[in-house]
């Protein structure tokens, strides 16, 4: 119970602190400016799949040791272009056995990963970084090796019964930080 309350509180604080934050990546700014789609539709009518965007998604490679594939993590910037809030109710991939949202917290000087339960609230007009050492997606029990240079698909499911398929790049470091350098 206390863990659930703590995680909910952390999610609220993170969402509020990220809501006004602009990204430091100039490449993301140019991508995000192109994200606003169907702006002539009412916020109440626009499905989550059209309003919510997973910008510059990437995941770390796995390591295969004696046939056992290590877990991985996925990062991106989550953007909701509308005033309306949506809820993420599940994430899946045919390449990954289990997928969870995690938040890194500092507990008495020790960083710990905490699972964030569904449904995950995506507030209106929000721009949230899922990045190393912070909020991220854990990829458990990959069914295949994820090697640098590979791509795979992941599906996000929303409470309005829509879904969004996202192509994820596999890289040792954020491949989008290298664009234009």
Curated annotation (Swiss-Prot):
Superkingdom of origin organism: Bacteria
Pfam families: PCuAC
PANTHER family: BLR7088 PROTEIN (PTHR36302), COPPER CHAPERONE PCU(A)C (PTHR36302:SF1)
Name of the molecule in the record: Uncharacterized protein RP573
Organism, as annotated: Rickettsia prowazekii (strain Madrid E)
């Amino acid at each position: 119970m206390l863990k659930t309350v703590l995680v909910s509180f952390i999610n609220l604080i993170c969402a509020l602190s990220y809501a006004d934050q602009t990204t430091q990546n100039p490449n993301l700014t140019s991508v995000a400016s192109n994200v606003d789609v169907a702006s002539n539709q009412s916020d109440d009518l626009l499905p989550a799949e059209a309003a919510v965007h997973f910008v510059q998604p990437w995941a770390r490679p796995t390591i295969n040791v004696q046939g056992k594939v290590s877990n991985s993590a996925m990062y991106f910037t989550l953007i909701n272009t509308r005033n309306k809030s949506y809820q993420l109710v599940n994430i899946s991939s045919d390449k990954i056995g289990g997928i969870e949202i995690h938040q890194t917290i500092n507990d008495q000087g020790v960083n710990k990963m905490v699972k964030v339960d569904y449904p995950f609230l995506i507030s209106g007009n929000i721009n949230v970084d899922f990045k190393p050492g912070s909020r991220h997606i854990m990829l458990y029990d990959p069914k295949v090796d994820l090697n640098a240079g590979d791509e795979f698909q992941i599906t996000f499911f929303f409470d309005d019964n829509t879904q969004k398929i996202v192509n994820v790049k596999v890289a040792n470091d954020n491949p989008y930080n290298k664009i234009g350098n």
